Amino acid sequence: MHFPNHEAAFKVIAEYLTDKDFGVIKSTSEVKYIGHRVVHGGKFTTPERVTPAVVEELRKVIPLAPLHNPASIIGIEAAQKIFPKETEHFVVFDTAFHQTMPEKAFRYAIPNHFYTEDKIRRYGFHGISHKYVDARTRRHFNNPHLKNITLHLGNGASMAAVNEQGHCIDTSMGFGPNEGMLMGTRCGDIDSAVVFFLGKKGLSNDEIAKIFNHESGMKGI
């Protein structure tokens, strides 16, 4: 099914939910809460109720997740238009689970001011998935104190190390969701010299980003 925009998609969702034959509710007024997954939460470490201030913070970190956060913001705003004003919206972040990483795990070995001023550090992604897998593993083995290595395997792929307390202490993805494992169309770890080399060949930053994000990984090889 093709939709021209997010708002049109949410209209169809609302119609299905309230359909007289197979719907599960009579009116969209029965929808009290809507949850939105957002890839990059920046400074946020816990789920947040959507407010104008929260959306503004998500806009600030668009440069850190340019392929994901803009669509998330559009989706949030579309849902707010289609569903009643009384419906509360919440955001959960892929980066939040990894905020317990120690500094030795999240810092890059580059000049300090890039961290303090530009917030260049390893954030990690797929945190919602890693947290779920870790929790299910502990329940499955009836052991709340396991040390786990969790994997998220899809077109994007990542690993995380979780300690006995259920806190992430390291992960394979970093500043963006391109670092780490070889993925479907993303290159994963690559020598920074390759970036300089491609730049000298005349490729722009946008062209290099397109290659690394959409034309590499399993597709590339």
Name each model feature, range by range.
Residues P4-A8, A53, P70-I74, G124, ...:
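Conserved active-site and cofactor/substrate-binding residues in soluble primary-metabolism enzymes
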Residues E57-G75, A79, E117-R121, F125, ...:
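A gly/proline- and charged-residue-enriched helix-loop-helix capping module
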Residues F97-K200:
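Glycine-rich phosphate-binding loop of actin/hexokinase-like ATP-binding domains
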Residues G75-H89:
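A structural motif corresponding to the C-terminal end of an alpha-helix
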Residues L17, G23-H68, E88-F90, A96-A105:
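Short beta-strand-loop/turn "lid" adjacent to the catalytic site in phosphate-handling enzymes
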Residues K200-I221:
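A mobile "lid/hinge" subdomain adjacent to the ATP/sugar-phosphate binding pocket shared
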Residues M1-F3, G174:
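Short glycine-rich, Thr/Ser-proximal phosphate-binding strand/loop in the N-terminal lobe
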Residues I34, D94, Q165-G166, F212:
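Buried hydrophobic positions in well-ordered alpha/beta secondary-structure cores of metabolic enzymes
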